[in-house]
Amino acid sequence: MSGLNMNRRKFIGALGLGTAHLLFSNPLYAADTRFSSLDPLQKVTLGNSGIQTTLLGMGTGVHATNRSSFLTRQDEAKSLELLHHAYEKGIRYFDLADTYGTHQMLAKAMEKMDRKELTITTKIWERGGGIPENERPPADVVVDRFRKELNTDYIDLVQLHCMVDDNWTDSMKAQMDILENLKAKGIIRGHGVSVHSLPAMKAALESSWVDVIHVRINPYGIAMDKPDPQEVVEVIHQLHNSGKGVIGMKLVGDGKLQNDSEKIDNALNFVLGLGSVDMMIIGFEEKEQIDNYIGRTQKALAKLHN
């Protein structure tokens, strides 16, 4: 197995045989022991953005669209209990978006949290669908609404949501300039993008505007920008080396692997072992899942340190 020529079948087979550590001796997959401890909730810095948060974060976009998601559809008390449990366990990163409809819910949960400890990310939807079609105002108007919904003076990170075109840095230039101005004013601490195609990811690599990027990553190519993880990993390494913060999402293939314990562990070992993903977000639906992933992440970190 050498470099980018490694056969994908062998790659997946290595994971299945529990020999994923062999992949990390390859420069493409090698860990740089960047994580300072075995603590799954240790503080990490997102690239050169200056934003610090926990290695493990909570996503709120499970089965989400049109300002609706798992958290907004189930009993509110249960969702608040879930958010509070994440906080009590030490999670300090919460991932939101306009299309998830979770701003007001987190605002309620934050009544029992220390805002200064939190990293709140949310995202602006610019594509068709997702939100009412007439709601595409300038980014400063959108961010003002977000702050009111969240009941907060500032937002840590605001991203353009689900970019897929290779020219998004041109088509979104006006919104990007507004977000840059909001950052200069301290209304947001950073800006960036979540991408859902490899061309969009490569465009982000070339853009100095991107502070932090969400990337879809797992060792199985499920719900990713390419079915071959090697192609995605190469760009992720470049993003990291350029100083951009890298947040890993879809670690369990958009939930498709959530009932396969071995593949969950393989995914955690793989993503943490890359050395180029700053933190990971998981869309939790039960308190037990939070506890479970904290334990699994700790074990994965222990493997890396050994």
Task: Report residues per predicted region.
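Beta/alpha (TIM)-barrel catalytic core signal, keyed to glycine-rich beta->alpha loops juxtaposed to Asp/Glu
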Residues: 9, 40, 163-306
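Conserved, mostly hydrophobic/aromatic
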Residues: 46, 58, 94, 120, ...
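Active-site groove signature of glycoside hydrolases
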Residues: 150-166
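Acidic (Asp/Glu)-rich catalytic clusters
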Residues: 48-50, 107-115, 147-151, 205-208, ...
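Short, acidic/polar
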Residues: 71-85, 135-149, 197-203, 263-270
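N-terminal binding-site loop/beta-alpha segment at the start of enzyme catalytic domains
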Residues: 2-118, 270
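A short, structured active-site edge motif that brings together acidic residues
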Residues: 116-130, 161
